Regions:
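Short, charged, surface-exposed hinge/linker loops at domain edges
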Residues: 1-19, 52-90
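Short aromatic-glycine-(Arg/Gly/Cys) micro-motifs in beta-strand/loop hairpins
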Residues: 22-37
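Structural detector for hydrophobic anchor residues on beta-strands
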Residues: 18, 30, 40-42
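A short, exposed loop/beta-hairpin motif centered on an aromatic-Gly-Thr core
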Residues: 38-48
């Protein structure tokens, strides 16, 4: 059996965005971060820009972690995990 990474990226990203916390920094920029997910933060001049930047950061961090074999934090119970699968092409 081989292993594959099984996940729904859009569901994971949406969970991150739903649970993100937003605040203005001392320079007036909006900072967005996903609690309990190191490296999942972004900023923008507005809420919308910070949210869109955070979407890109979450997607990018997940892709990088998959390539490098790093652990990806669960967000509200949504995980990206490795599973055994049977190769049906043989």
């Amino acid at each position: 059996m081989s292993k594959i990474k099984f996940f729904a990226l859009s569901r994971y990203v949406e969970a991150g965005l739903q649970h993100a916390e937003y605040a203005r920094d001392e320079n007036g920029a909006v900072v967005a971060q996903v609690p309990n997910a190191d490296g999942f933060y972004a900023q923008g001049e507005s809420f919308e820009e910070a949210r869109e930047n955070l979407r890109e950061v979450i997607e990018g961090n997940v892709m990088l972690a998959l390539q490098l074999g790093w652990t990806i934090p669960a967000i509200e119970g949504i995980t990206i995990e490795e599973r055994d699968v049977q190769n049906l092409a043989a």
